[in-house]
Amino acid sequence: MRVKVIDADAFSYIFRTLEEFIDEITLDFTSDGLKIRGIDPSRVTFIDILIPAGYFEEYNVEKEEKVGVKLEDFTDVLKTVTKNDSLYLETDENQNIKVTLDGVYERTFTFPSIVASEIETPNLNLEFPFKAKALTVTFTDIIDEIEDIGGDSITFKAEGGKLYLSANSDMGSSTIELSTENGGLLESEGGDAESVYGLEYVVNTSKMRKPSDTVEIAFGSQIPLKLRYNLPQGGYADFYIAPRAE
């Protein structure tokens, strides 16, 4: 297996985001692309990612290969990527994964494959009463603003085709309206709904602003929030965040 990433910096931010939730992952290289699944230790957030073969400049995968890595070590290397670096991933005969950064000079790092914990896929057959789409930078900037207010929860409320995000803390409260009319949303559909989620989990997805241009937001009353950060060539990073009992 050997692949070459087109935008190494953007690629690194997918893993920087994952590191906010989990400690180890299995990289599943298939004919369709690189698949990654994970669930955080508190079992609040389930993650499902597809980085399609077309996302890569080169994608040489003859058969499915799974490689487990410790995210901290793997991400520390990816954080050293510079704008002009080419990034290669490949496996050797022992299923170790080699990361090569080729820029002004070549740097190579080899990580032993680990046996990552098996992921039990939750039931994701969900019907979402409200769905919307926004620019990723718009959504994540708003989430960052709400984080500044403090508090540990965020309320998602859909009413009249508009999306309201709000939070409360000792510092005060904040409510932000997003709609197609004010440009906060690119599109929206569905009925009214309201649910509360842990603010930390939503904030931890915000690094996806780097590799993703648009985000799809779907939720309903007392069901998980789904954030789909769209990636080039039909890829996606899905985050399912369980609601809080309020």
From Swiss-Prot:
Record flagged with keyword Coiled coil: no
Gene3D superfamilies linked to this entry: 3.70.10.10
Molecular-function GO terms, alphabetical: DNA binding; DNA polymerase processivity factor activity
Pfam families: PCNA_C (PF02747), PCNA_N (PF00705)
Keywords: DNA replication, DNA-binding
GO biological process: leading strand elongation; regulation of DNA replication
Keyword DNA-binding appears in the UniProt entry: yes
Signal sequence, renumbered to the chain: none
PANTHER family: PROLIFERATING CELL NUCLEAR ANTIGEN
Quaternary structure and partners: The subunits circularize to form a toroid; DNA passes through its center. Replication factor C (RFC) is required to load the toroid on the DNA. Forms dimeric complexes with PCNA1 and PCNA2, and trimeric complexes with PCNA123 and PCNA323; does not form homotrimers. Crystal structures show a heterotetramer of 2 PCNA2 and 2 PCNA3, which would be large enough to clamp a Holliday junction.
UniProt function note: Sliding clamp subunit that acts as a moving platform for DNA processing. Responsible for tethering the catalytic subunit of DNA polymerase and other proteins to DNA during high-speed replication. Both trimeric complexes inhibit DNA ligase and both 3'-5' and 5'-3' activity of Hel308 (Hjm) helicase, but stimulate Hjc, the Holliday junction cleavage enzyme.
Entry similarity comment: Belongs to the PCNA family.
NCBIfam families: PRK01115.1-3 (NF002220)
Protein name (database record): DNA polymerase sliding clamp 3
Organism: Sulfurisphaera tokodaii (strain DSM 16993 / JCM 10545 / NBRC 100140 / 7) (Sulfolobus tokodaii)
Lineage: Archaea, Thermoproteota, Thermoprotei, Sulfolobales, Sulfolobaceae
